[in-house]
């Protein structure tokens, strides 16, 4: 299966083509996608764009819903922004 | 880096615009296009198929080349009758239509319990969606919990992809499910599906009258505590996949002023809502499963394209599928004890971290929003709304645009 490489918090990650950014973040080993308003670690709940818990920064763009965005080669993903 | 967002006004007017590219939306678009209508289909996911057909080739029989598909696009407002405002990642679009079919589907009902905000506690459909999106689950220990037939489908999928499904905890009583099972005898197709499911689930513990009362872990989930027959025990696991049935996504129909029924959006025989030229099909009219969604979509598609006679030929098929939906709802209704799940310090609103103690001091949604910010975060009450409807009997407040967070630039219309 063809793979592509992107970076999650600076770490190079290879994912199968067609993977969502949420999967890449999980593969990178990050359990925390974002920090809640009281400082709790949070990660995806609904997997379908409803809950907004999967928000990360992609190529400098904040609040991207990682469950709904396909990975692209060379993407720079930052968690916990 | 600031984004360059272009505002585009589409010159074309579509005969039929379909919102949602799940089974109901695909069936509606296909039938409308076959009837000669110019059809646009809008969906916020990268590909058509909805949740049930995510990352699969199954939608293909329903995909019609004549349908113009706008993927990765969210409807955030309806600035004037016959116009939809869409936001895409780098551009906005105004789309004009004569008839509108809303097939916005359903989401899982989440109920708050201690620890439910920990990473790796997810919806049942949520974990399945993530696995389909590339999350590796091979060898992961997973507890599947909550309610409804979705739990079985999810457990089967997860196991089929190498996960160690420790058990399925179904909150409904076995007697209710048994009665539901008897009802299936009238539907041979459903019975065959049930038998196929059993084969894929062989050896997985299926515990009825069982539900999670707490998830534990430090940085992420480490174990879940379950309750059954007054006994509690703890299961170590990597993921908890937990959803208490489905609830319809009625926000967009509500924005258009469509009247609601007991189960979702109210529709007539032709799937038309209380608003002229606006139709609803699929789970948004009431949870009924794939077969009902398809036939409702077909009816709406024919009707919106001006073919009421073709629509009428499908009324009988819809009726039998609706009976199945009713039986399903009765069998898996959430039990009253689940109202005791959240503790005082359990967050009900995950966007604004509002505890159950604070929300419970309020007497209605409006007061809770004003005093606690519950439901005021990015999800706009889509997660806590379903919970509070069950926990406190609160009906959702009115919907105002933007129906989802939108870029500031999207709110300023050109010209």
Predicted ranges, named:
Chain B
Residues 281-316:
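A conserved FAD-binding loop/helix module that cradles the flavin
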Residues 122-131, 239-288:
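FAD-site-proximal beta/loop scaffold in flavoenzymes
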Residues 34-51, 166-175:
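Glycine-rich FAD pyrophosphate-binding loop
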Residues 62-88, 95, 161-251, 261:
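A Rossmann-like FAD-binding core segment of flavoenzymes
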Residues 16-38, 154-158:
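N-terminal Rossmann-like FAD-binding beta1-loop-alpha1 element of flavoenzymes
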Residues 272, 302-341:
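Active-site-proximal substrate-binding core of FAD-dependent oxidoreductases
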Residues 11-24, 140-145:
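Beta1/beta-strand and adjacent pyrophosphate-binding region of the FAD-binding site
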Residues 106-143, 147-154, 262-269:
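Glycine-rich dinucleotide-binding loop and its adjacent helix/turn
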């Amino acid at each position: 299966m063809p793979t592509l490489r992107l970076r999650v918090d600076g770490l190079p990650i290879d994912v199968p083509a067609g993977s969502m950014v949420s999967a890449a973040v999980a593969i990178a080993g990050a359990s925390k996608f974002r920090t809640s308003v009281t400082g709790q670690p949070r990660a995806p709940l609904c997997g379908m764009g409803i809950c907004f818990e999967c928000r990360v920064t992609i190529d400098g763009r904040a609040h991207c819903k990682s469950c709904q965005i396909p990975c692209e080669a060379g993407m720079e993903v930052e968690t916990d922004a | 880096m600031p984004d360059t967002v272009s505002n585009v006004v589409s010159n074309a007017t579509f005969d039929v615009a379909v919102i949602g590219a799940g089974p109901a939306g695909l069936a509606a678009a296909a039938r409308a296009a076959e009837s000669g209508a110019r059809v646009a289909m809008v969906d916020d996911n990268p590909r058509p198929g909805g949740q049930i057909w995510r990352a699969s080739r199954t939608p293909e029989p329903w995909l019609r080349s004549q349908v113009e598909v706008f993927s990765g696009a969210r409807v955030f407002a309806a600035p004037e009758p016959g116009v939809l405002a869409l936001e895409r990642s780098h551009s906005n679009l105004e789309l004009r239509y004569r008839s509108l079919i809303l097939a916005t589907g359903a989401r899982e009902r989440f109920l708050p319990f201690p620890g439910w905000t920990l990473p790796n506690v997810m919806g049942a459909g949520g974990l399945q969606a993530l696995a389909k999106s590339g999350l590796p689950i091979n060898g992961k220990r997973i507890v599947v919990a909550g309610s409804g037939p979705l739990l079985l489908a999810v457990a089967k999928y997860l196991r089929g992809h190498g996960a160690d499904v420790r058990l399925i905890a179904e909150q409904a009583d076995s007697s209710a499910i048994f009665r539901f099972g008897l009802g299936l005898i009238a539907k041979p197709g459903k019975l065959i599906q049930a038998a196929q499911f059993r084969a894929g689930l062989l050896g997985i513990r299926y515990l009825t009258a069982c539900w999670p009362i707490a998830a534990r872990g430090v940085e992420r989930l480490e174990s879940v505590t379950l309750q059954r027959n007054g006994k509690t025990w703890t299961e170590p696991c990597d993921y908890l996949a937990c959803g208490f049935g489905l609830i319809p996504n009625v926000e967009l129909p509500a924005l258009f002023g469509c009247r609601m029924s007991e189960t979702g959006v109210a529709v007539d025989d032709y799937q038309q809502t209380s608003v002229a030229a606006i139709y609803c099909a699929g789970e948004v009219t009431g949870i009924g499963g794939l077969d009902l969604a398809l036939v409702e979509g077909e009816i709406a598609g024919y009707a919106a394209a001006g073919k009421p006679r073709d629509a009428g030929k499908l009324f009988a098929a819809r009726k039998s599928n609706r009976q199945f939906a009713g039986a399903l709802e009765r069998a898996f209704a959430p039990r009253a004890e689940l109202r005791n799940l959240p503790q005082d310090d359990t967050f009900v609103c995950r966007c604004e971290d509002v505890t159950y103690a604070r929300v419970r001091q309020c007497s209605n949604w409006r007061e809770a929003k004003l005093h606690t910010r519950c439901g005021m975060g990015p999800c706009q009450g889509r997660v806590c709304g379903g919970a509070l409807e069950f926990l406190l009997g609160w009906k959702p407040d009115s919907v105002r645009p933007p129906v989802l967070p939108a870029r500031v630039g999207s709110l300023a219309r050109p010209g």
